[in-house]
Regions:
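Conserved RecA-like ASCE P-loop NTPase motor core of nucleic-acid helicases/translocases
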Residues: 108-116
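Short, glycine/serine-rich, charged loops/turns that create anion-binding
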Residues: 68, 74, 116-118, 152
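Conserved helicase motor "Helicase C" RecA-like lobe of SF1/SF2 P-loop NTPases
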Residues: 116-147
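Glycine-rich phosphate/diphosphate-binding loops that line cofactor/substrate pockets in enzymes
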Residues: 96-107
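Phosphate/oxyanion-binding active-site loops and adjacent basic polyanion-contact surfaces
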Residues: 81-93, 123-128
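Amphipathic alpha-helical interaction segments
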Residues: 62-66, 91, 130
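Conserved helicase ATPase core of P-loop NTP-dependent helicases/translocases
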Residues: 141-159
């Protein structure tokens, strides 16, 4: 039904020039707390597999989701935990800042995507807020660190 009303064009159909992507992976080691929490996830999974817990209380989807959050930052599961110096977020901030410094004369823009977390104003931990705070503390002007979530009109989104 969707195809009846949609005009779909794929990249190969319109031959758009696309820049060559340069991928790189940054590996970070987990904190001791993360290692302990991974062991706890394994224990939870064993209980679920063994049928020892009601699926409304815990299930593999919840465990997997908690594992994804934990892999990003331990504070995603418990915002009372410390900010681990060698976390993925801190590695990301280091990289963003390095690129910002290297391209400051060109006023280049960077886009950063995070599929976990959203900006929050309720005092709880947010990956977005943490990254913004750290970039501003390093000297990037606050006006240069924006979230798509803050663009509440089509005009703002185009800017």
């Amino acid at each position: 039904m969707f195809k009846e009303v949609a005009d779909i064009k794929t990249a190969d159909m319109i031959d758009l020039p696309v820049p060559q992507a340069h991928y790189h992976n940054v590996a970070v080691k987990p904190s001791e707390m993360q290692k302990e929490m991974v062991a706890s996830l394994a224990e939870r999974a064993e209980k679920v597999r063994g049928g020892n817990v009601d699926s409304s209380v815990d299930n593999m989807l919840k465990i997997t989701n908690d594992g994804r959050k934990l892999a990003l930052d331990q504070r995603m599961l418990n915002d009372m935990l410390p900010d681990f110096e060698d976390s993925k977020i801190n590695a990301c901030v280091d990289n963003i800042y390095r690129i910002w410094e290297e391209t400051a004369d060109k006023k280049s823009a960077q886009l950063v995507f995070c599929d976990l977390s959203t900006p929050k104003n309720d005092g709880s931990f947010s990956v977005y807020n943490d990254i913004r705070k750290k970039l501003i503390e390093r000297g990037i002007p606050e006006s240069e660190v924006e979230f798509i979530h803050e663009a509440d009109t089509d005009i703002k989104k185009k800017e």
